[in-house]
């Protein structure tokens, strides 16, 4: 049978197969090798007397480290304009990480009750021509929540963003009573409350949402300098148009991306962040 791991606690994995959930252990070959099952994995299992064994882990489309979860297809990147104050650099880092992991994005601006339309203009300009969906929410009063719920279908969604923007409130508004506290899980599964617990997939609206926020580390050092340009979707239409095929859209003459910035077709703040990140990668990787 094929299913998906929705929970992992102390060496036990809970695999959802259609409408059933099976408690499984992993074959020793996984424990001895470098590949260990994690939440989000698509797996083949055999079940004998109601107990399952994971026989195969299917290839992953991606793997997040914090939290450890695989095959994530969608991210709700949550920010506020005030309380805490919006940071375009921080948002850009989240966007790069999602692009790198091939995760589609919805940028969610929470606490819109605290701002007026004028304060929302900079974020709209920042994301102009990027293709990213921009949603305005008030998670406490559930404004905009239904639309997000509709996008959960057939996705594994992670919620991420800086501290204090209302990620937990948003997740509770979306998942409602489906969200289980650690103690509840421990009681249900008859395991100790201090048992090591990893992420869990909560089933909502025909999809899954990861119950712990994603991307706790925003380090970009692992990205190749020459691949950075591929993580900015507003650059795509200029691929192959620059004078030099190796153009990284920095100081080269005949760069169509720089021309687009000058003409206002690419947001200059996003471009400046790109150049700054490019230069940091150059120094760290000794490309200069």
From Swiss-Prot:
It is an enzyme of class 3 (hydrolase). The keyword Protease does not apply. Zn(2+) binds at residues 242, 247, 249, 255. The keyword Transmembrane does not apply. Its cofactor is Zn(2+). One of its GO terms (cellular component) is cytoplasm. Keywords: Cytoplasm, GTP-binding, Hydrolase, Metal-binding, Nucleotide-binding, Ribosome biogenesis, RNA-binding, rRNA-binding, Zinc. One of its GO terms (biological process) is ribosomal small subunit biogenesis. One of its GO terms (molecular function) is GTP binding. Belongs to the TRAFAC class YlqF/YawG GTPase family. RsgA subfamily. One of several proteins that assist in the late maturation steps of the functional core of the 30S ribosomal subunit. Helps release RbfA from mature subunits. May play a role in the assembly of ribosomal proteins into the subunit. Circularly permuted GTPase that catalyzes slow GTP hydrolysis, GTPase activity is stimulated by the 30S ribosomal subunit. This is Small ribosomal subunit biogenesis GTPase RsgA. The gene is rsgA.
């Amino acid at each position: 049978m094929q299913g998906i791991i929705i929970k992992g606690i102390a060496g036990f994995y809970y695999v959802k197969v259609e409408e059933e959930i099976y408690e499984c252990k992993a074959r020793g070959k996984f424990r001895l090798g470098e590949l260990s099952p994690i939440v989000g994995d698509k797996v083949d299992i055999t079940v004998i007397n109601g107990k399952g064994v994971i026989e195969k882990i299917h290839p992953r489309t991606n793997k997040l480290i914090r939290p450890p979860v695989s095959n994530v297809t969608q991210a709700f990147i949550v920010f506020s304009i005030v309380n805490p104050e919006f940071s375009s650099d921080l948002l850009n880092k989240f966007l790069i990480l999602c692009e790198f992991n091939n995760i589609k994005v919805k940028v969610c601006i929470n606490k819109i009750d605290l701002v007026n339309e004028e304060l929302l203009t900079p974020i709209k300009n920042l994301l102009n021509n990027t293709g990213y969906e921009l949603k305005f929410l008030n998670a406490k009063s559930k404004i905009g929540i239904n639309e997000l719920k509709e996008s959960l279908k057939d996705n594994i969604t992670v919620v991420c963003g800086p501290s204090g923007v209302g990620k937990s409130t948003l997740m509770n508004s979306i998942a409602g009573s489906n969200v289980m506290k650690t103690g509840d899980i421990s009681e249900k599964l008859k395991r100790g409350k201090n048992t090591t617990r990893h992420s869990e997939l909560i089933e909502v609206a025909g999809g899954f949402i990861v119950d712990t926020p994603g991307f706790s580390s925003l380090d970009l050092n692992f990205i190749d300098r020459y691949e950075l340009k591929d993580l900015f979707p507003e650059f795509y239409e200029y691929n192959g148009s620059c004078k030099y095929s190796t153009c990284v859209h920095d100081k080269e003459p005949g760069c169509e991306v720089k021309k687009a910035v000058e003409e206002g077709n690419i947001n200059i703040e996003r471009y400046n962040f790109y150049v700054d990140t490019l230069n940091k990668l150059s120094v760290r990787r000794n490309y200069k």
